[in-house]
Amino acid sequence: MENFWSIVVFFLLSILFILYNISTVCHYYMRISFYYFTILLHGMEVCVTMIPSWLNGKGADYVFHSFFYWCKWTGVHTTVYGYEKTQVEGPAVVICNHQSSLDILSMASIWPKNCVVMMKRILAYVPFFNLGAYFSNTIFIDRYNRERAMASVDYCASEMKNRNLKLWVFPEGTRNREGGFIPFKKGAFNIAVRAQIPIIPVVFSDYRDFYSKPGRYFKNDGEVVIRVLDAIPTKGLTLDDVSELSDMCRDVMLAAYKEVTLEAQQRNATRRGETKDGKKSE
């Protein structure tokens, strides 16, 4: 009987191995499932290992620095320009474009010291992830309750100055898988202006050369080019300037996004030995 089940297990594993290598869709589902499983396991780990950092008010430093190594198996390589701009002392609001759950991997490559994340409140109910987020001093915001959202803005501005923290925000407010940027929401800019602290724009290149949820593919290799732009001061600005500030940040980030995406595509092609038309070079 034991031999029978051994044969069944071997047969099923063989089928999965074959499907993984011949079916793009199966390959996608297996890799993305294992990626989410990695997030779950990492969340369980940091529920314990993050406690000392949490007690010292160090933000999410350990969470992201360790997650970078947990995800080495993905084959995704990151190239970072301007890393030192995120490591400066003092509070700041870090804004970044939002594409998919793979953003966590990109964030891990460049995580600023003493930085926390702002997330939508619904994520506070994801098992283990929520505990890891709590120990990372994550700030949850209820986007559908204006009164609570505004209270969170005031709380963030106060805490960041008092504890010398940086805050990572996705100003688009939701994932954008279609390329480019959708209009920015004003929360991050309200916080920066209220606290009179600088904004540090971070731009991730487009992932669609190696990953796409609608396209159902997640290739074994991928290049992400990350660029940190110069900090944008907010001293002297008022809430009346928020709309103009938001548009200006979006414009400079969008220009950088086009440049880093082109570089990432070229790096991917070189890595795979492809010519400009996408064919393998001889």
Swiss-Prot record:
<keyword id="KW-0472">Membrane</keyword>
<keyword id="KW-1133">Transmembrane helix</keyword>
<keyword id="KW-0443">Lipid metabolism</keyword>
<keyword id="KW-0808">Transferase</keyword>
<dbReference type="GO" id="GO:0006654">
    <property type="term" value="P:phosphatidic acid biosynthetic process"/>
</dbReference>
<dbReference type="InterPro" id="IPR002123">
    <property type="entry name" value="Plipid/glycerol_acylTrfase"/>
</dbReference>
<feature type="short sequence motif" description="HXXXXD motif">
    <location>
        <begin position="98"/>
        <end position="103"/>
    </location>
</feature>
<keyword id="KW-0812">Transmembrane</keyword>
<keyword id="KW-0444">Lipid biosynthesis</keyword>
<dbReference type="GO" id="GO:0005783">
    <property type="term" value="C:endoplasmic reticulum"/>
</dbReference>
<comment type="function">
    <text>Converts lysophosphatidic acid (LPA) into phosphatidic acid by incorporating an acyl moiety at the sn-2 position of the glycerol backbone.</text>
</comment>
<feature type="transmembrane region" description="Helical">
    <location>
        <begin position="4"/>
        <end position="24"/>
    </location>
</feature>
<keyword id="KW-0594">Phospholipid biosynthesis</keyword>
<keyword id="KW-1208">Phospholipid metabolism</keyword>
<keyword id="KW-0012">Acyltransferase</keyword>
<dbReference type="Pfam" id="PF01553">
    <property type="entry name" value="Acyltransferase"/>
</dbReference>
<comment type="pathway">
    <text>Phospholipid metabolism; CDP-diacylglycerol biosynthesis; CDP-diacylglycerol from sn-glycerol 3-phosphate: step 2/3.</text>
</comment>
<feature type="transmembrane region" description="Helical">
    <location>
        <begin position="32"/>
        <end position="52"/>
    </location>
</feature>
<feature type="transmembrane region" description="Helical">
    <location>
        <begin position="122"/>
        <end position="142"/>
    </location>
</feature>
<protein>
    <recommendedName>
        <fullName>Putative 1-acyl-sn-glycerol-3-phosphate acyltransferase acl-2</fullName>
        <ecNumber>2.3.1.51</ecNumber>
    </recommendedName>
</protein>
<dbReference type="GO" id="GO:0016020">
    <property type="term" value="C:membrane"/>
</dbReference>
<dbReference type="GO" id="GO:0016024">
    <property type="term" value="P:CDP-diacylglycerol biosynthetic process"/>
</dbReference>
<dbReference type="GO" id="GO:0003841">
    <property type="term" value="F:1-acylglycerol-3-phosphate O-acyltransferase activity"/>
</dbReference>
<comment type="similarity">
    <text>Belongs to the 1-acyl-sn-glycerol-3-phosphate acyltransferase family.</text>
</comment>
<dbReference type="InterPro" id="IPR004552">
    <property type="entry name" value="AGP_acyltrans"/>
</dbReference>
